[in-house]
Every structure is written in C-alpha cells, then in structure tokens.
C-alpha cells in the first residue's frame, strides 16, 4: 500500500531509487495494494508474478465442502466487485500522468519537510526515505509528547517504537 503506486513513478521522475522490482533476479512476485497511493478504496490488491508458472502456487482448493470442490486463485472468495470497480475507475481517471503528478508533488513537499526537520538540532529523520512517507525522532526530547501536542492542533501522525518516532505519510491534494 505504500510503495507499489509510488516508487515506480518516483523512479520515472528521476529520483534515486534502490532496485525493488523485477530488475532484481531474486524478486519473483510483487504485491501492490491499490489504496493509499493508488487512491482506490481498500480491498483491492494486485499480485504481479515474474513467470506465469508461479501462478500454480497461488490456487486454493477445498474438497470438504457440501457443494463440492471449491477452487479459486484469489482469497477474496465471492466478495462483491465494488472495490475492484472503484480501483478501475480511479486508475482510468488518473492514468500514469495523474499518478506521476501526485508523486512529484509529494516528493517536493517531502524534501522541504525533511530539510525543515533536519534544521532542528534535536530532531533526526531516520534512514533515507525513498517513498512518500518518512519517520523522525529525537534522542533528546520525547517525540511522543511532540506528537500529542501536534495532534491537539489537528496534525495527526503514526508512531513508531524502534526507534521512537513520528511517521508521516504524505499525500497530494
């Protein structure tokens, strides 16, 4: 849900990106959720396989059912297709250009936010974030207290515990 509809477009836009896809020989499958940066409702995911032969390992079959054998290649069973229709409509509406535009906006804001956070001596951005999210914390101040204070002002964030951090997932308007 975090990288599948973000990292490929960031890579297209020329942002330095470690290999994460089928360019790595060891990657045989990629799961991509369509919510968050795919902008679809929850409940739709994709599974990309390097080789069609791998599909044989993604079947579910159950013989002990009164109606007979039940076999499916999806774990969704007989759920309705509303989320799927939503995802299709959003993808058709945005197209690659729409996703690229949103990723470009998010990356620009993320860069400014990281620069601003790094300008505060007591704060540290953890790692080298490549996606539209990042975490930051402090070894000098209680970052959870900072998060609580920001929440009172309407700024909500996720929290991480190892190391203690605030997690920001950015989005384009």
Task: Identify the function of each model-found stretch.
Residues 87, 166-167:
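Glycine-rich, often proline-containing surface loops adjacent to acidic residues and nearby aromatics
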Residues 169-173:
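PLP-dependent enzyme catalytic core of the Aspartate aminotransferase-like
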Residues 8-132, 136-141:
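Active-site C-terminal subdomain of aminotransferase-like
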Residues 1-4:
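Catalytic nucleophile loop
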Residues 146-153:
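Short amphipathic alpha-helices in soluble, non-transmembrane regions
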């Amino acid at each position: 849900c975090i990288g599948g509809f973000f990292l490929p477009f960031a890579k297209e836009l020329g942002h330095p990106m470690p290999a994460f896809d089928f360019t790595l020989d060891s990657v045989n499958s990629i799961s991509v959720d369509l919510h968050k940066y795919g902008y679809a409702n929850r409940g739709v995911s994709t599974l990309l396989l390097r080789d069609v032969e791998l599909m044989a390992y993604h079947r579910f079959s159950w013989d002990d059912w009164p109606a007979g054998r039940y076999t499916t290649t999806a774990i969704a069973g007989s759920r309705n297709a509303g989320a799927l229709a939503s995802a299709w409509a959003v993808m058709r509406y945005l197209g690659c250009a729409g996703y690229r535009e949103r990723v470009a906006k998010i990356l620009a804001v993320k860069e400014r936010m990281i620069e601003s956070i790094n300008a505060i001596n007591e704060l540290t951005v953890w790692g080298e974030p490549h996606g539209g999210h990042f975490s930051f914390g402090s070894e000098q101040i209680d970052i959870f207290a900072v998060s609580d204070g920001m929440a009172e002002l309407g700024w909500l964030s996720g929290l991480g515990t190892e190391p203690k951090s605030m997690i920001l997932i950015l989005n384009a308007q």
